[in-house]
Amino acid sequence: MRLGLDPVLQDAIRLGTTVLATAGDDLSSERMQAGRVYVNYPASSPYVLGCGGTRIALDGARGSIVNETVWNDDGVHSTGGGISEEYQVPAFQAAARIPGSLNDGRRGRGVPDVAAAAAPTNGYRIFLNGVDFVASGTSAVAPLWGAFIALINARRGQSLGFVNDRLYQLPNLLRPIVTGDNKDTTGLGYNAAPRLERLHRGLGSPDGGAIVTALTTIA
């Protein structure tokens, strides 16, 4: 699949299309019980903006975010993320202190690139076909980031296209997530770490207004 899809993703970049994908909701182990960690494709492709998940706590009175951690529901469901064994560290992650894989210690493409609220308790209200329900997981995060990109494209009057390199040049526009992990019930997985050691939540979660403003005006 990787060999067949990557050329298509490269074509998308040449056409000015931003491609986003979810990091998955099954921890770093993908619940495989194989004693190894994995990353989801195509989020692991260097031609894709990989989207991971967080959990937010809100101030009940003001509705503002008071705390944000890696989304992990007791080692059963959690954001995916880790180190690719198929791709080397891409140029846009060269300044990030990507650690080695828990499998063999080798460094590679870090997944995801960005994150946003994904926990079921932070779900997104959806109204579809007359039904009102709540969606969550990284499958909700990727469309959220897609909406940011679409809004920016509309304001710019042209497509951002491949956005990874620009986001990594503007890390202060995202909230770093430095607590939590995506470990399973056996303890297998990655811990959150300070900015520039970005696993399972990427650069961080968005300050939507700041991102839209900055990327609307960027060349």
What is the meaning of each model-derived region?
Residues 1-219:
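Extracellular protease catalytic domains of secreted zymogens
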